[in-house]
Amino acid sequence: MSSTKDVADHHLKAFLAGDLDETLKDYAEGSVFISPNGIAHGRDEIHAVFNRLFAGLFAPGTYTFTVDMEHCEGDVAYTLWLAECADAGIVLGTDTVVIRDGAIMTQTVALKLAPKG
């Protein structure tokens, strides 16, 4: 079984590579993804979320991403991050994941956009 840190690290690496299939490997069928845009239930809906992200704001090769802080405690991993994207800066981003049996069961995301121009 993978540790919380192992799964969180794999998830970040897959996300930064823009690898949709590898990113989705971290989720269980019953996973929930919660963001300011709503709640996605299960792999199919989470697939759609990441497909939009990789086609838009986080299109591979179009942004820089900086991890400011990471904490793992038990089955919870927290990441504080910043990004500079083509159309906006993200001055504050956070992800919290709850990992059980080697898979992300729940993920929350929050971010503060600073539009360019």
Give the positions of each predicted feature:
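Short acidic/polar mixed-charge low-complexity motifs
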Residues: 39, 87-91, 103
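Short beta-strand segments that buttress and anchor functional surface loops
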Residues: 78-86
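Residue-level signal for tight coil/turn positions that link beta-strands
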Residues: 73-76, 101
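A solvent-exposed, acidic/Ser-Thr-rich amphipathic alpha-helical stretch
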Residues: 20-22, 28-73
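Short beta-strand edge/turn micro-motifs at domain boundaries
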Residues: 92-117
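Short, surface-exposed coil-to-beta transition loops
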Residues: 63-65, 89-95
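Terminal "cap-and-tail" regions of soluble proteins that handle hydrophobic small molecules
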Residues: 2-7, 13, 43, 47, ...
